[in-house]
Amino acid sequence: MADFEELRNMVSSFRVSELQVLLGFAGRNKSGRKHDLLMRALHLLKSGCSPAVQIKIRELYRRRYPRTLEGLCDLSTIKSSVFSLDGSSSPVEPDLPVAGIHSLPSTSITPHSPSSPVGSVLLQDTKPTFEMQQPSPPIPPVHPDVQLKNLPFYDVLDVLIKPTSLVQSSIQRFQEKFFIFALTPQQVREICISRDFLPGGRRDYTVQVQLRLCLAETSCPQEDNYPNSLCIKVNGKLFPLPGYAPPPKNGIEQKRPGRPLNITSLVRLSSAVPNQISISWASEIGKNYSMSVYLVRQLTSAMLLQRLKMKGIRNPDHSRALIKEKLTADPDSEIATTSLRVSLMCPLGKMRLTIPCRAVTCTHLQCFDAALYLQMNEKKPTWICPVCDKKAAYESLILDGLFMEILNDCSDVDEIKFQEDGSWCPMRPKKEAMKVTSQPCTKVESSSVFSKPCSVTVASDASKKKIDVIDLTIESSSDEEEDPPAKRKCIFMSETQSSPTKGVLMYQPSSVRVPSVTSVDPAAIPPSLTDYSVPFHHTPVSSMSSDLPGLDFLSLIPVDPQYCPPMFLDSLTSPLTASSTSVTTTSPHESSTHVSSSSSRSETGVITSSGRNIPDIISLD
């Protein structure tokens, strides 16, 4: 009864392919859906199957869930006992199909004749079996001595599954193999402590469970390499693989870039429950692969840079010896190199070097920045030298001491030149080398910059002999002014600058308004308004133009005896006859001059105003 339950559980765990093989071996219909196939297999088991069918069930189950090396040890024992031509009629051993007939699906064994002698069956099938097994390649070892290349950004903490060969278990194209591993409580604790929650509910781990695949070659350390049609399941969940790389040429099959696989998110973080990995792939002739699982700790570029600095800086004499070797004249060559020009700019970031670095395997002197190189490989690990496009692994990187000295000595140079003796000199740009000499220009400190677009500066007669240059760019760019801005001087108009037309207002708008005070000769004032031949017409106040700003409204009122009574004239001429001097009213924005004479009542004031100091507003108050 226990055997029946065990066989029933084995059949229930079969896939469609195993069910079809079992039903075909028993001579039953093997077409249909999985549910139908499973019901037929269980019915076959309940109806009392033969021992050969039971052996076939155990064989299929052992293929699907391989256990240990005990099966292979039993395999060699069974082979030696089965193929011995002793002619004994002993019954078939339970593991016989595993050894002999698993590669021959169509055998001459009759399932319903368990009492038939096995010797005759073996004698009939011995020859063709050996003919088919002769060209088959030898079985690779289960744990080959495969070494994987070290990954600089990962420290290996423990080995969960040693490198194990992906052995072909049948002649079918697509193969599948299962692996089981368990975590210890300490390993589970380290993984949980390193967990970090990211936005979107995602989780990231610094301590990771890493799966690696490579070719089963023992000649040299192997890089990560995936077989064709790879499919990985961890605890029954499909693991997403990296995308395909673009093919280098047309017609070449696309392959995934080889890199380690972080399966931590699908692993059961428990020491009580084991984890199962299912790997299916397409077999290739002449290529065998192996897999391994590690517990690793992920590092950052800053950590690797610190480790690189701890290795120390290479002696500058090594670089000088390399320079002398490159510049040594070759007697067989007609062309000799006398100097080497090297840039101090990083070819990766196009910036000045901070930590000059290069690989020991490189033959050039040009360095690249170590921090940028590590950051680039942290995102996409290629480890290719940006100068010569050759392999530059992390283990071969060095910090150049000579370039360290050069960067510390000159901070404003981007290129240097090495001489034959190993010395160097900076290479400055031609624009800096050619300095244009010119006469110094004197700067007028008393000048100031105003908010107006134009400024007027009036110099004295002594300063007119010199040619002063005002640098408005320097004045405007300076944030702090040492001296306060000088005040503008008032310009007074002389007698010759006054208007030659008597009694006519001259108005010319100007952007600079300078108050002026003019002295008017009393002889220039007309005795009365009757001296003018032009008849005077009274102009109403509403019709006066607004273009006459800054004028005293009383000076515009006509003083004529025929229009105004004597009492009104007396009130108007009383302030004018008080004195014959000029009264000047100035303000920051307007200036006007009122001149009066005390000759008679009919006399009036003549307004003389410069065109530059007339305001724009007439006050009626």
From Swiss-Prot:
Coiled coil feature spans: none
Residues with the Phosphoserine modification: S476, S477, S478, S499
Location of the region described as Disordered in the Swiss-Prot/TrEMBL record: 577-621
All residue ranges annotated as the SAP domain in the record: 11-45
Cross-referenced CDD domains: SP-RING_PIAS2 (cd16819)
Short motif LXXLL motif, span: 19-23
Modifications after synthesis and translation: Sumoylated.
Subcellular location: Nucleus speckle; Nucleus, PML body; Nucleus
Self-association and partners: Binds SUMO1 and UBE2I. Interacts with AXIN1, JUN, MDM2, PARK7, TP53 and TP73 isoform alpha, but not TP73 isoform beta. Interacts with STAT4 following IL12 and IFN-alpha stimulation of T-cells. Interacts also with GTF2I, GTF2IRD1, IKFZ1, DAB2 and MSX2, as well as with several steroid receptors, including ESR1, ESR2, NR3C1, PGR, AR, and with NCOA2. Sumoylation of a target protein seems to enhance the interaction. Binds to sumoylated ELK1. Interacts with PLAG1. Binds DNA, such as CDKN1A promoter, in a sequence-specific manner.
Family: Belongs to the PIAS family.
Entry note about domains: The LXXLL motif is a transcriptional coregulator signature.
Record PANTHER family: E3 SUMO-PROTEIN LIGASE PIAS2 (PTHR10782:SF12), ZINC FINGER MIZ DOMAIN-CONTAINING PROTEIN (PTHR10782)
Entry protein name: E3 SUMO-protein ligase PIAS2
Source species: Mus musculus
